[in-house]
Amino acid sequence: LLPVLQAEFGTLYLDEIDAAHLAMFYSKLRQTRKQSLYCCPKGFSIIMTDHGFTRNSLRTKAGVAESVITSAIRGQNIRPYSAEKIVSALGLPLSEVFCEISSEQYLDANTVLHYHRVMSSILQTAVTWGYIPDNPAHIVATPRKSNKPIKYLQPEDVIALIETMDRDHVPAKYRLALLALVLTGMRREELLATRWMDIDFTKGTLEVVQAVGYIRQKGLQIYDTKTTGSYRVISLPDCLLSEFKSYREYKDKQLEPIGLSVQDSDYLFQEADGHLLWPSSVTSWVRKFYSRHPELQRITPHGLRHTNASIQLNNHTPLPAVSETLGHTNSQTTAAIYAHVIQSAKVAASRQVDSILAPYLKNR
């Protein structure tokens, strides 16, 4: 987002950004093609080894996720900034390694709406700080959001997922990550930035204080959720607290032979070398796991967050409580995203009332 916003508004003072400018910007976005992608048709693994790299050493030098290197080896598409970092590490021109694949698709409505929300948030902060008198984004016609239905699992699908992971003896960190996502409703980036000190085992809570994000040219960065409105304290179910305790004991046993132990400042989820686990690594692992189990209902890590919300709403958890758990800025956001789930819950509640009172009314 940042490069696009800087190109459009970077030379303007805040009070020069008006509603007309914002409307024109959204119109341009709707006519913008999605970013082109790159692939390597020549056998990337040969290029890599010819230049003295292993998969891991190239990943480290280029500063990209392991899944990116895997995609390049398989001839799959990768993003431009990843391709640029890889060829920089190899010391080769971009055109010698990758071919550009132009996109024929335009930015969708949800992407344009996301730009609007970011600009509105920036301008509202400027109002709060007294730089401008009012927020011009409030009077611009809001880009319409696509009504594409969200995907989530039913409770029985969640149970099947857990049972299959246990039968497969999947890596402990990925098993716990998926359990935590579905039991807390956290965003993937928030969970991967969680430290042991953020969990209060006495109170049974988890404080969401930071998240991990990728910044071009800088790699993975940690940012404070208090600046994004996503800070919150989540109550943890007993079963997840138990899983966290078991995982910490497991990590302690791993470190014991070298005279170390888990520290409160450590992240829960780390690579073998101690670095932060890349968010894309979790998504890549989930994709591979489901490819081995076509019998399961497929879901993404973000879909597990939707699953948590749907379970709460279908069990009549008040909307403000669900919104707070998810870290939404207000209940309206939650209601808009989960409108279909809320409507289904209302129908179920109506039928429940009917099942209780109907026999009496019919016998009058």
Predicted regions and their residues:
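Short, Lys/Arg-enriched alpha-helical recognition elements, typified by the DNA-recognition helix
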Residues: 1-127, 139-142, 265-266, 283, ...
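Hydrophobic (often cysteine-bearing) scaffold residues that line and stabilize catalytic clefts
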Residues: 18, 111, 115-118, 154, ...
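Basic, Lys/Arg- and aromatic-enriched nucleic-acid-binding interface segment
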Residues: 32-51, 78-84, 102-115, 128, ...
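Short, basic (Lys/Arg/His-rich) helix/loop patches that form interaction surfaces
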Residues: 34, 60-64, 105, 163-174, ...
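A short, basic/aromatic helix-end/turn motif that makes direct DNA contacts
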Residues: 60-64, 74-75, 91-92, 193-199, ...
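Catalytic-site neighborhood detector that most strongly recognizes the C-terminal catalytic loop/helix
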Residues: 73-77, 152, 211-214, 326-352
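DNA/chromatin major-groove-contacting recognition/catalytic segments
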Residues: 83-96, 100, 164, 216-223, ...
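C-terminal secondary-structure termini that scaffold catalytic or DNA-interacting sites
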Residues: 203, 214-231, 235-240, 246, ...
